[in-house]
Every structure is written in structure tokens, then in C-alpha cells.
Amino acid sequence: MENKRKQKDEIVLVNGSNDTTPNKKQKNELQVVSSGGGREIILGTERTSKLEHPIMQLIGHKGEIYSCKFNSYGTALASGGSDKEIFLWNVYGECINYSVLKGHKGTILELHWSTDSNEIYTACTDKSIGVWDSNKGELIKRIREHSGVVNSCCPARRGPPLVASGSDDRSARIFDTRSKGSTHLFQHKYPVTSVCFSDASDQLITGGIDNVIRVWDIRNQEDPLYTLASHQDTITSTSVSKDGAYLLSNSMDNSCKIWDIRPYAPPNRNIKTFNGAQNNFEKNLIKSSWSIDGRRIGCGSSDRQVYIWDTNTKQLQYCLPGHSGTVNEVTFHPNEPIIASCSSDKTIYLGEIKP
């Protein structure tokens, strides 16, 4: 075929070893990346990050993806879902899928990196919590103390290597990964769908299908310090801001809320509510997250969009299309204006936004 000059808006499709890739990549290219080697390139966007292209689509999972997180350095992304595997991806360059961690026997519902990024923790429907060596790609420990699906897990930011978990068995537990057995047990009347630690790691925050968020002093496993009861449906995620002052929650009532969890805060701790993101009949545990500076929050949605709000003005800054299935998690890069989103459509997007 006679070569023709490529137009600015042309899409170049390259599969495998096909040699039609342009020799010089433009600064403003967008790229779709597959772990199988194929990619598409679209031209025409102003750059704000060190991503190789403004939008990168990561393909390789064989099932729905329910969780994705950047490591603390922002150089790697971990993802997990219904194919029972954890994929590790390079964030920069060609976004290569450099490792696949296998060992779970059920769907991975949530994952987190340790603070030093040397370990990954996973919550799974096989009733276990996995502790993985992210460098060797090996399973270090499988914790089996729950009698039901483990919906959520979260490592402590400070102190000993503690990991919290929440389960359909109506309990939340805390484990020290250096020892056997749980160190703390928090009984609930209903399944626990989300857990997270306070910034100081001296409190555990739990949410469940009774629509209530409970804040526990980990030294007192009998009764919570206080409860946060403003959501009208199941709590699907909880996360604490970087400064430890605020809690972000997401719910099946189609709202995200910010709570003041500082000591001596007024009784009505719900200070802001963000509407727009949806949760439909699938009833997925859709997750929300903070940007590292706390100026933005992001949330997945069953309407296949990525939602990002300004936390000061409550203004919706972005409603981003692209996925063809429910967006189950949105997470922010620790150093750059980059977001990652994972979906039931088996794909992940990395995209840069304005600083």
C-alpha cells in the first residue's frame, strides 16, 4: 500500500510485531497498551505527567477487575479481580505487565501495598487474606481465620505490620503479619464490607451492610468510640485522608461523604456530601479515594464513568468516559496528576489530569 502522510487525528493500530509503528512518537500521543503486545495511538492532547502517553489502557486480566493501587513510589500498579490473579504493571514507559501473582482460589475484592511497597495484601472470596512479596512475586502467607468472604483489607500506615480485614462472617479482625492468629476481633451484627485504619493506626474504621460506619479504639474491642450514621445503604469503601483528619466513605446510596474524624469534632461529623456516582443492581463494592494532597476525591460508578470532585468547592471536575463496564475503583498517583481506574470490562486506564 502506498504510504500516506498521517493526519493529526489518525488512529494507528499495531499488533504484535507489526512494523507500522511510527519511528518518532509525538509528545502528545495517547496509547492503549495490552499485555499481549497490541496498541492504538491517538494524537492530540497537552501533557501534564511523565506517562508515556496521556491515556494508557492496560489489558491482560481475564475477568472483572475490582481493585487497583499505585505503590508508594508511583512506579508500579497492582490490580486484582475475578480471575484470581494479581497483575503488577509498570506505570511508566510501555506499562509492561511485569509479574502475575497466583495463589488465591477466589475473586480478589481489594488489595493494598504496604507502606514500603515490599508487600501486597489482598482480600478474597476464598475467605482468606493474602500477604505477598511484591519483589519476588511470591505468596508469603495466607491468613485463614474468617469463616466468610473477606470483603476488605487495609494495612496500618504506622507502627507494627498490622493488617485489618472485614468479612461476611460479621467480624473485623486485625493481624500482625509476623505472627499467627488475629490480635484483635471486632464483632458486628451484620457483614463488614469495608475497613481502614486511622492515620496513627490506633483506631479501626469499619463499614457494613447496616449503612453505619463505626470507629473503634483498637484497645477496646467491645464497643466503638462513636458511629457515623448518615448513609442510607451499604458502605462500599472507607479511606482516611493523608493528614488523618478526614474520612471518605462511599455507599450504595449513590453518595460519597467526607467526615471530620479529628478528636473533639462536633457531633455532626458529616461535613460534605458528593452525589453523582452510581451503584446499580450489580451491588459491587465500588471504591473511592483521596488525592495525596486531599484537594480531590475520586470514585468509580456503575454508569461506567470516573468521577472526580474538588473537595473544597464540591464541584465535579471530571466525569470521564472510556470504560464499557462498572468502574470499581479510582485511585490517585502519589506524586503526579495521574489517576488509575479499573473496571468490570477487564481493563485498567491510566490517565493524566490537570494538576
Curated annotation (Swiss-Prot):
SMART domains per record: WD40
Subcellular location, record wording: Nucleus
One BP annotation, GO: RNA splicing
WD repeat positions: 60-99, 103-142, 145-185, 187-226, 230-269, 280-319, 322-355
Coiled-coil spans in chain: none
PROSITE patterns per UniProt: WD_REPEATS_1, WD_REPEATS_2, WD_REPEATS_REGION
GO cellular component terms listed in the entry, alphabetical order: catalytic step 2 spliceosome; nucleus
Pfam families cross-referenced by the UniProt entry: WD40
Keyword presence, Coiled coil: no
Keywords: mRNA processing, mRNA splicing, Nucleus, Repeat, Spliceosome, WD repeat
InterPro entries tied to this protein: G-protein_beta_WD-40_rep (IPR020472), U5_snRNP_Component (IPR052234), WD40/YVTN_repeat-like_dom_sf (IPR015943), WD40_repeat_CS (IPR019775), WD40_repeat_dom_sf (IPR036322), WD40_rpt (IPR001680)
Quaternary structure (record): Component of the pre-catalytic and catalytic spliceosome complexes. Component of the postcatalytic spliceosome P complex. Part of the U5 snRNP complex. Component of the U4/U6-U5 tri-snRNP complex.
Function according to Swiss-Prot or TrEMBL: Required for pre-mRNA splicing as component of the activated spliceosome. Component of the U5 small nuclear ribonucleoprotein (snRNP) complex and the U4/U6-U5 tri-snRNP complex, building blocks of the spliceosome.
Name listed for the protein in its UniProt record: U5 small nuclear ribonucleoprotein 40 kDa protein
Gene name of the record: snrnp40
